[in-house]
Regions:
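Pair of pore-lining "gating" transmembrane helices in MFS-fold secondary transporters
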Residues: 7-29, 109-113
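C-terminal transmembrane bundle of multi-pass solute transporters/carriers
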Residues: 2, 9, 35-202
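Short helix-kink/termination motifs in transmembrane helices of multi-pass secondary transporters
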Residues: 18, 26-38, 121
């Protein structure tokens, strides 16, 4: 495990991808935690409306996973991943701003599709940029960072929701996620995304 940590720390691409996974999961997944609150307080549809919202998100997630798997290895996936993060943030805010059930379902379908697509690409990039001998340990480190971001994001959101309400907190999280993706896009090579798998293994 120590060798994996050293490998991640020394390679800009792996370091950036791991941190991106942790921060993105921190910011994105509180949406699912507070979706019942959004259904009840924003859309005023109650339990039945929440079920439809969650179903829409799930359908989008399935479509995103299948589409990403079918597309396979294509150039420019790093940029596509960042675009998906921006799309998730925009669609989620639009779902809350719509104020109506059916438009919100459509936007959440896009949210599910885009966030799963982003994380699918992110996971494949981590594996491709890791040394063969250390791939298992590198993926374990990434998985720890990714999965650790989920509960921490929801925990932090819980404290903020008490003061600002769920819509503002989720909207703020989405804004930060969009800014993160935009920053990584502008940084380009300095963020480590210019490294190809072959270059990162040297």
């Amino acid at each position: 495990m120590i060798a994996g940590l050293v490998h991640v720390r020394r390679h800009p691409a792996l370091r950036t991808l791991t941190l991106t996974g942790a921060v993105a999961s921190f910011l994105a997944f509180p949406l699912l935690t507070y979706l019942p609150v959004i259904a009840g307080q924003v859309l005023r549809t109650g339990a039945s409306g929440y079920s439809l919202l969650l179903t829409s998100f799930g359908i989008g997630a399935i479509v995103g996973a299948l589409a990403t798997a079918r597309r396979g290895h294509v150039p420019g996936r790093e940029r596509a991943m960042l675009l998906y993060l921006v799309l998730f943030g925009g669609a989620t805010v639009a779902a809350m701003a719509s104020g109506r059930q059916w438009p919100a379902m459509g936007f959440l379908l896009v949210s599910g599709w885009s966030i799963v697509s982003a994380f699918s690409i992110l996971n494949s990039l981590v594996q491709e940029n890791a040394l063969d001998a250390l791939r298992g340990r590198v993926v374990s480190i990434y998985s720890l960072a990714f999965r650790g971001g989920m509960p921490l994001g929801s925990l932090t959101a819980g404290f903020l929701v008490r003061s600002f309400g769920a819509p503002r907190v989720i909207g703020g999280y989405c804004l930060v996620l969009v800014l993160l993706a935009a920053s990584l896009h502008l940084l380009g090579p300095r963020a480590g995304f210019a490294l190809t798998p072959d270059e990162s293994r040297t």
